[in-house]
C-alpha cells in the first residue's frame, strides 16, 4: 500500500465516524480536491471545524510581545488633561453662585499679576546694576589670579626643560647627562684619531 492509499482509508474512516453535517462538508472538500488535483486540500479535510473554533478562542502561547510605545502614554496624558478641563468647565456651569466666586478670584488674580509686573520691572533695573558689579569683581579676581599663574608657569617650564631628551633614543627611565656622554665620545674619538695620526 502506498501512502496515499493509507491516507484515503484513514479519511474514509473519519468521514464515517463524523456527524452527518461534517460528512457532507468532507465530501465537498474531496470533490474540490479531485477537481483541482491538489494534495493540500486533503490536509484541510483532516481539520475539524470545532478545533478551529477552539483554537481561535485560545491565545497563542508563542505570541510576540508588543513593543511599548511612549506615544500611547502621551495620548493618555492629553486625554486626562481634556477630562480635567471638561470637569472644570462643568463645575463653573453648575451653579451661578460658583461662577460669581470664580469671577472674584479672577479679579484678584489679575491684580496680583499686575503687581508682579510692576515689581518685576523695578527688579530688572536692579539686576542690571548687580550684573555690572559682578563683572567688575570677576575681572579683578581674574587679574589677581593671572599674576599667580605666570609665576607657577615659569617654575614648571624650568622643570620640564631639564627633562627633555633631545636625541630620538629611548633611555628606559635612565637619566642621561648628555654633556658627560659627549665628552666621553670626544675622548674616544680623539684617542682614536690620535692613534690614527701616529701610524701615518
UniProtKB/Swiss-Prot annotation:
GO cellular component, one term: nucleus
Residue ranges of the region described as Disordered: 1-200
Polar residues: bias regions: 25-41, 159-168
Amino acid composition bias (Acidic residues), ranges on this chain: 102-139, 146-158, 191-200
Compositionally skewed regions (Basic and acidic residues) per UniProt: 1-13, 42-61, 78-101, 174-190
Residue ranges the record marks as coiled coil: none
Cellular location(s): Nucleus
SMART domains in alphabetical order: CHZ
InterPro entries, alphabetized: Histone_chaperone_domain_CHZ
Pfam families xref list: CHZ
UniProt keyword terms in alphabetical order: Chaperone, Nucleus
Main location: nucleus
Subunit structure: Forms a heterotrimer with H2A.Z-H2B, stabilizing the association of the histone dimer. Also, with a lower affinity, forms a heterotrimer with H2A-H2B.
Function, in words: Forms a chaperone-bound H2A.Z-H2B complex that acts as a source for SWR1 complex-dependent H2A to H2A.Z histone replacement in chromatin.
Protein family (similarity comment): Belongs to the CHZ1 family.
Protein name as catalogued: Histone H2A.Z-specific chaperone CHZ1
Organism: Lodderomyces elongisporus (strain ATCC 11503 / CBS 2605 / JCM 1781 / NBRC 1676 / NRRL YB-4239) (Yeast)
Gene designation: CHZ1
Amino acid at each position: 500500500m502506498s501512502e496515499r492509499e493509507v491516507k484515503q482509508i484513514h479519511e474514509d474512516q473519519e468521514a464515517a465516524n463524523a456527524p452527518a453535517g461534517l460528512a457532507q462538508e468532507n465530501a465537498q472538500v474531496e470533490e474540490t480536491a479531485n477537481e483541482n488535483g491538489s494534495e493540500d486540500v486533503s490536509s484541510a479535510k483532516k481539520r475539524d471545524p470545532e478545533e478551529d473554533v477552539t483554537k481561535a478562542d485560545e491565545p497563542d502561547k508563542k505570541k510576540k510581545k508588543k513593543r511599548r510605545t511612549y506615544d500611547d502614554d502621551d495620548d493618555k496624558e492629553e486625554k486626562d488633561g481634556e477630562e480635567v478641563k471638561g470637569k472644570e468647565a462643568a463645575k463653573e456651569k453648575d451653579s451661578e453662585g460658583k461662577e460669581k466666586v470664580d469671577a472674584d478670584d479672577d479679579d484678584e488674580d489679575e491684580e496680583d499679576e499686575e503687581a508682579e509686573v510692576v515689581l518685576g520691572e523695578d527688579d530688572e533695573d536692579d539686576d542690571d546694576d548687580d550684573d555690572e558689579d559682578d563683572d567688575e569683581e570677576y575681572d579683578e579676581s581674574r587679574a589677581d589670579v593671572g599674576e599667580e599663574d605666570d609665576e607657577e608657569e615659569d617654575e614648571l617650564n624650568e622643570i620640564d626643560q631639564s627633562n627633555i631628551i633631545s636625541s630620538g633614543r629611548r633611555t628606559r627611565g635612565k637619566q642621561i647627562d648628555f654633556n658627560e656622554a659627549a665628552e666621553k665620545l670626544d675622548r674616544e674619538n680623539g684617542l682614536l684619531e690620535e692613534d690614527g695620526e701616529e701610524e701615518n
